Amino acid sequence: MTDTLPSTFTASLAEVDPEIAEVLQLELGRQRDYLEMIASENFVPRAVLESVGSVLTNKYAEGYPGRRYYGGCEYVDIAEQLAIDRAKSLFGAEYANVQPHSGASANAAVLSAIATPGETILGLELAHGGHLTHGMKLNFSGKLYNAVAYGVDPETFLVDMDAVRDRALEHKPQVIIAGWSAYPRQLDFAAFRAIADEVGAKLWVDMAHFAGLVAAGLHPSPVPYADVVSSTVHKTLGGPRSGFIVSRDTELAKKLNSNVFPGQQGGPLMHVIAAKATAFKLAATDEFKDRQARTIRGAQLLAERLTAADSRASGVDVLTGGTDVHLVLADLRTSELDGQQAEDILHEVGITVNRNAVPFDPRPPMVTSGLRIGTPALATRGFGDTEFTEVADIIALALRPGADTRALRARVDALTAAFPLYPGLAPSAS
């Protein structure tokens, strides 16, 4: 009988907390009515939303399947083991840990497992497309470790493996990091492996951005080359916001596990782990592979449009001249617009992106001279060549002087109307 429970337990969110309910409605409307092109964002399937909002959120389960510190874990053990097995199968790994709450916590566990505080780590320079957790001085990785960096070539903006080798020979790092948050090309994992072996370093690959492309067989896998690989689940993989770790090295398994729990975290988020299991299952499907192919194709169409003569004439270009992955880095150094202004104009026409520094950027980090523009969410929404060509043209025109933002917004509205998002959820608040 429901009357044995307090009314606040059985009431809806709208009844208990109308302010937060309104925020959820407004955000649903924003996601429906804008074109989401932040490279690190995606839309999760309805099945993933169900798991994240499920009763598994009630269960505490410190430890690992079959080795918990709490009773009543027989069903969450099944969920976590499914996630582990599916991650291993998807990426051809011998080991997987699916407990990290985020990519950053996965990275912290990896570093603490393979390096001792004070030892040297070598990663891509943050200002050249690296990540905070790869050695930024204000991040744990830069505070606990002696972080040195390699960069990109000032002419090509590509990672120069000869320069990486020179830095490795100079600094003799204990860990070499291959991975990025804003780099539009594939990395040479075999070359990184050779350099790591030459200097006696562990090779850690952070594939957070391109894991979905790897799962679909559209990007080289780092797993055969790296000692350990970390990732998020919510970017190209299109799962819940969270992280995971995989490796072929079963000898590292105990150290990695102990550095996730109890080293970095306490109780795992079982509702999120169940959602990861579902995301990994979906990532093995043909539909997912098609989506990843459309993701890459969409980014390439955007790069082609932004390198056209009219875009270059207005001061817009693309770093490295194109892309191999799910994102494009627009270079605005010779544009009348800085990164902040360009982000604001695109928001006005209904496209959400983020300003991003370009290598050797003359502008401050909160302003920048670039945009990072990603295609995963639009591919998930169903966009193909026709729609991505239209989006690319809208962006190119929006970044030109005197853009007719009202007309461009109407073109965006036509696209969002043609590809409704989460039609089964509550109506848009917009």
From Swiss-Prot:
Pathway: One-carbon metabolism; tetrahydrofolate interconversion; Amino-acid biosynthesis; glycine biosynthesis; glycine from L-serine: step 1/1
Localization annotation: Cytoplasm
UniProt entry keywords in alphabetical sequence: Amino-acid biosynthesis, Cytoplasm, One-carbon metabolism, Pyridoxal phosphate, Transferase
N6-(pyridoxal phosphate)lysine carried by residues: K235
Record-listed (6S)-5,6,7,8-tetrahydrofolate binding positions: L126, G130, H131, L132
Pfam family, one: SHMT
Known catalytic reactions: (6R)-5,10-methylene-5,6,7,8-tetrahydrofolate + glycine + H2O = (6S)-5,6,7,8-tetrahydrofolate + L-serine
Cofactor: pyridoxal 5'-phosphate
Sites marked Plays an important role in substrate specificity: H234
Entry GO CC: cytosol
UniProt xrefs under InterPro entries: PyrdxlP-dep_Trfase (IPR015424), PyrdxlP-dep_Trfase_major (IPR015421), PyrdxlP-dep_Trfase_small (IPR015422), Ser_HO-MeTrfase (IPR001085), Ser_HO-MeTrfase-like (IPR049943), Ser_HO-MeTrfase_PLP_BS (IPR019798), SHMT-like_dom (IPR039429)
Chief location of this protein within or outside the cell: cytoplasm
The UniProt record lists the keyword Transferase: yes
GO molecular function terms listed in the Swiss-Prot or TrEMBL record: glycine hydroxymethyltransferase activity; pyridoxal phosphate binding
UniProt-listed HAMAP family: SHMT (MF_00051)
Subunit structure: Homodimer.
PANTHER family linked to this entry: SERINE HYDROXYMETHYLTRANSFERASE, SERINE HYDROXYMETHYLTRANSFERASE 1
Similarity section: Belongs to the SHMT family.
Function: Catalyzes the reversible interconversion of serine and glycine with tetrahydrofolate (THF) serving as the one-carbon carrier. This reaction serves as the major source of one-carbon groups required for the biosynthesis of purines, thymidylate, methionine, and other important biomolecules. Also exhibits THF-independent aldolase activity toward beta-hydroxyamino acids, producing glycine and aldehydes, via a retro-aldol mechanism.
Record protein name field: Serine hydroxymethyltransferase
